[in-house]
Design a protein with these regions (language model features):
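Short amphipathic alpha-helix that is part of the acyltransferase structural core
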Residues: 1-31
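Short hydrophobic/aromatic beta-strand or adjacent loop that forms the aromatic wall/cage
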Residues: 43, 143-148
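A short, internal acetyl-CoA/4′-phosphopantetheine-binding micro-motif in the GNAT/acyltransferase core
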Residues: 73-81, 110-112
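Conserved acetyl-CoA-binding loop-helix of GNAT-fold acetyltransferases
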Residues: 81-94, 122
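Conserved active-site alpha-helix within GNAT-family acetyltransferase domains
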Residues: 86, 111-134
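Conserved GNAT acetyl-CoA-binding A-motif
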Residues: 96-115
Length: 152
C-alpha cells in the first residue's frame, strides 16, 4: 500500500468519483457526492493505492487561518479495517501541521443514528478527535451533524 499526495485536478476528481460511487451507504445523495467530487480539485488531497488501484482518499479544506477540516474521506469497503484510513489521516495531519494549522475538525452524522456512521464516529474517536458540538439541523433533522476537533 502506498499513500501519495495528488495535485492534478482531473486525477483527484476521478479518484473521488470512483471511490464515493462505490460507497452508497455513506455517499448516497447524488448532489452531495457531486459537490465532493467537484470540490476535490483544488484541495490538499491524499490517495491510497493498492498497486495502481486507488482504494482510499481524503482531502482537507481550510475553515479558518488556524483550522483545517478533514472534509471527506473514503476507503473501498473491501479495504476497511486494514489501517488505510489511519495511514491517510496520519499523512494529512502531518501535512496540515507543516502548513501551519493548529487544529483539525471533522463532521459526521451523530452517533446512534445509523450503524455505518456509528463505525465512522468510532474511527474518528480512535484517531484522537474529541466531541465538540452537535448541530441537530445543520444538514437536516434525520442527520444531526457531530463536529469533532483535535489539536495538531
Amino acid at each position: 500500500m502506498k499513500i501519495c499526495q495528488l495535485t492534478n485536478t482531473a486525477e483527484k476528481q476521478a479518484v473521488t468519483r470512483s471511490i464515493l460511487e462505490a460507497l452508497p451507504e455513506w455517499f448516497g445523495i447524488p448532489e452531495a457526492r457531486e459537490d465532493y467530487i467537484t470540490e476535490s480539485g483544488d484541495k490538499q488531497f491524499f490517495c491510497a493505492y493498492d498497486a495502481d488501484k486507488p482504494v482510499g482518499f481524503l482531502y482537507l479544506k481550510e475553515t479558518g487561518t488556524a483550522t483545517v477540516e478533514l472534509y471527506v474521506m473514503g476507503v473501498l469497503k473491501e479495504y476497511h479495517r486494514q489501517g488505510i484510513g489511519r495511514e491517510l489521516f496520519q499523512r494529512a495531519k502531518e501535512a496540515a501541521g507543516k502548513a501551519g494549522y493548529s487544529f483539525m475538525q471533522v463532521k459526521t452524522v451523530q452517533m446512534g443514528k445509523y450503524e455505518e456512521y456509528d463505525r465512522t464516529n468510532q474511527f474518528y474517536l480512535s484517531l484522537g478527535f474529541q466531541e465538540f458540538e452537535v448541530f441537530p439541523t445543520l444538514w437536516d433533522e434525520w442527520n444531526p451533524c457531530q463536529v469533532y476537533v483535535m489539536a495538531i
